[in-house]
Amino acid sequence: MFNLRIAEKSDAPMLAAHNCAMAFETENKSLDPAVATLGAEGLFQRPELGFYLIAETDSIAAATLLVTYEWSDWRNGLFWWIQSVYVKPAYRRQGVYSKMYKHLKELALSQPTPVCGFRLYAETDNQAAQATYKNLGMHACEYVMFEESVV
């Protein structure tokens, strides 16, 4: 059984560890743990940017994800971007992400600012993640993502 809760600032080191594990596993990237911790802590200093959701079992953080906000002037509502999804290997294929996703839907419906949808991106070769997202009702978009670092 998984209990869900919104993360608190004291969770930042664990969130950073999950982010480091996820980056290494999915992209073979080694994140600087100090920077990852500052990144997690930074969200708690600016809650208007989003929140983390944690799934726990027996006081162990089995899974975490980050939600950030994007305003859509076309829809007069927010898209919730689901990011930094990490489920510890021992808890995979047990429905934890599905439970988290369903909980996000419930949260979205209760917000004072309308949430018009969820978005996320997945590595192109991460077929397992893509299958999970499709099984929950998501579909691939017709957009191509571009990026340029400014720091």
Annotate each predicted stretch with a short phrase:
Residues 54, 60-69:
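Conserved beta-strand in the GNAT
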Residues 98, 124-142:
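Conserved active-site alpha-helix within GNAT-family acetyltransferase domains
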Residues 88, 99-116:
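Conserved acyl-CoA
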Residues 85-92:
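A short, internal acetyl-CoA/4′-phosphopantetheine-binding micro-motif in the GNAT/acyltransferase core
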Residues 114-129, 147-151:
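Conserved beta-strand-loop-alpha-helix junction that forms the acyl-donor binding cleft
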